[in-house]
């Protein structure tokens, strides 16, 4: 079946997280019609920190310079463009973190910039570029079917409403309903699973952090490694705050949380005392950093798709992007950025489809298959590598505090594989493959 030449090519974006919003701006730039279907009442994001590495920033600019500008408006870069990896257990000097010294294992130099911001600030910036009439809120997807007359996708929502689209892009996160519609929901189907890593996250005033830890330890990003856990502190000068992430490797299973809110399934109440006990064997800097958490806080389960990946990101007129496609642990700071890379390839591929007078189901399927082909292996690498980086930072194999050179080589190599990706080449490859595939797939294209 083929779309009528008089009907505009329409993209349905399910999910209004960062990947979905970035894709929307990229489509807008390329004059591709779209609608975002967001289950929440607004685009509100948590006020926790998020990082974007150089590859992600290049993809932002290629999507639309306003995406990169939205980020840089609210982002901070670590002093000197480095992340200091230190031994978080053994410190020299006193028990006062302002005067104690942690052994520097190595410095990770981020060429081109490693920047962080609060999620909510970035979202507030980027939504300003999306027309309000392109968004529908409180739309909880129930199923995706095919209109047998037109061949287009039919989205059915829990409120009884339906929508039609030429292609559907699932940007609906780790518990993706789009993914479920593609592959099913039983235990053998692709899905995100508990990685046995949990985290405590918080933002504290930078002045408070400086008073507790000292100016030297709050002027740059520091990753404190240690047995079974690690802590990352990132100063965000533009918002006068320090973002603290404390991660623990957990042997238990994550309990099933019954809630209508998808994000709350991965959150449990916790206390500062619980967090401080987990880091009791660490040095004074880590213990003091964790002590700045509020008395009542939350602990977050880290889910990824290492054990149950999707076999492909595309199936017919439907595909996945971001966490819905390749949820990963946050240990390399690359997950959100890979969603931006996904959005760039999709925006370019969909722009080609939108320019065609007619788009059949065959051509739409081929185009989305090209996106999957270009993005799949790199994304699966990140899932594996990010999990391994967490093992390195928590000394799973050995006391890396005593083998800094070997640790340095491993993490630096992984980091450059993440950062140095040829973004322009990725897009060129996708368009070249698309041209070859569709040339013989449909003469109406």
UniProtKB/Swiss-Prot annotation:
Binding positions (FAD): 38, 119, 323, 336
Pathway(s) per entry: Secondary metabolite biosynthesis
Glycosylated residues, chain numbering: 31, 358
Keyword Oxidoreductase attached: yes
Transmembrane segments: 8-28
Names of required cofactors: FAD
Protein family per UniProt: Belongs to the paxM FAD-dependent monooxygenase family.
Protein name from the UniProt record: FAD-dependent monooxygenase sorC
Organism of origin: Penicillium rubens (strain ATCC 28089 / DSM 1075 / NRRL 1951 / Wisconsin 54-1255)
Encoding gene, per UniProt annotation: sorC
């Amino acid at each position: 079946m083929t779309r009528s030449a008089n009907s505009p090519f329409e993209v349905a974006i399910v999910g209004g997280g960062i990947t979905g919003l970035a894709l929307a701006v990229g489509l807008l730039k390329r004059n591709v019609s779209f609608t975002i279907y967001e289950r929440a009442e607004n685009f509100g994001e948590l006020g926790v920190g998020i990082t974007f590495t150089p590859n992600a920033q290049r993809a932002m600019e290629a999507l639309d310079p306003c995406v990169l500008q939205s980020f840089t408006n609210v982002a901070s870069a670590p002093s000197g463009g480095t992340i200091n990896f230190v031994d978080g257990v053994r410190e020299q000097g006193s028990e006062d973190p302002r005067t104690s010294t942690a052994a520097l294992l190595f410095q990770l130099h981020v060429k081109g910039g490693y920047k962080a911001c609060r999620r909510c600030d970035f979202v507030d910036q980027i939504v300003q570029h999306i027309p309000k009439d392109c968004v529908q809120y409180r739309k909880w997807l129930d199923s995706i079917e095919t209109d047998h007359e037109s061949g287009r996708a039919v989205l059915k929502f829990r409120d009884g409403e339906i929508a039609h689209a030429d292609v559907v892009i699932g940007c609906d996160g780790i518990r993706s309903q789009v993914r479920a519609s593609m592959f099913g929901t039983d235990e053998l189907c692709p899905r995100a699973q508990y990685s046995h890593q949990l985290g405590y996250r918080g933002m504290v005033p930078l002045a408070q952090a400086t008073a507790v830890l000292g100016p030297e330890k709050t002027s740059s990003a520091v990753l404190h490694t240690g047995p079974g856990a690690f802590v990352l502190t990132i100063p965000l000068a533009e918002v006068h705050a320090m973002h603290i992430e404390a991660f623990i490797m957990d042997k238990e299973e994550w309990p099933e949380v019954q809630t209508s809110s998808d994000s709350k399934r991965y959150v449990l109440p916790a206390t500062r005392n619980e967090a401080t006990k987990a880091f009791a064997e660490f040095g004074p800097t880590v213990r003091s950093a964790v002590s700045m958490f509020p008395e009542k806080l939350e602990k977050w389960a880290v889910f990824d798709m290492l054990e149950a990946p999707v076999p492909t990101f595309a199936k017919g007129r439907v595909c996945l992007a971001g966490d819905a496609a390749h949820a990963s642990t946050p240990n390399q700071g690359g997950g959100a950025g890979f969603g931006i890379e996904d959005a760039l390839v999709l925006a370019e591929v969909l722009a080609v489809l939108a320019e065609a007078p007619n788009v059949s189901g065959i051509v739409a399927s081929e185009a989305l298959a090209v996106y999957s082909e270009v993005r799949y292996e790199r994304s699966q690498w990140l899932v594996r590598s990010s999990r391994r980086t967490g093992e390195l930072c928590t000394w799973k194999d050995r006391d890396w505090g005593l083998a800094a050179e070997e640790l340095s080589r491993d993490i630096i190599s992984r980091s450059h594989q993440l950062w140095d990706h040829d973004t322009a080449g990725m897009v060129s490859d996708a368009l070249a493959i698309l041209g070859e595939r569709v040339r013989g797939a449909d003469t109406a294209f």
